């Protein structure tokens, strides 16, 4: 797989302590695009130093806005697949080849599943996701998308 076909969108807000390691761990699998959502720390500098493409929001616009900006950048770069993951390091980058493999085989969406215990509201939403759509953890930040 040509890594330039895969964008790894990482929304980040004040994640200077972890973002460099997350970016470094994803470099072999795609183009890390960090969306710094108005951080007041050194998130942008750490992400750039690790080799990420950085999209900078001047103010905190929220998670959805950060994802939208990352998807727009991925489209601008003509990426075929987009993988989203959290900036805090909770997702194991070693799973990325499996996500890419599912996308290459024709999946339009791949959703990760977290190992940690969920809060009550997350548990209820996960139950609804399993019941309605067959998705184990709809709130997990690790997802893979096929661009159409």
Tell where the protein language model's regions lie, with residue ranges.
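Conserved nucleotide-sugar donor-binding
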Residues: 127, 140-148
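Structured catalytic core of nucleotide-sugar glycosyltransferases
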Residues: 1-119, 145-148
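A transmembrane-helix-recognition feature enriched in membrane-embedded lipid enzymes
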Residues: 119-137
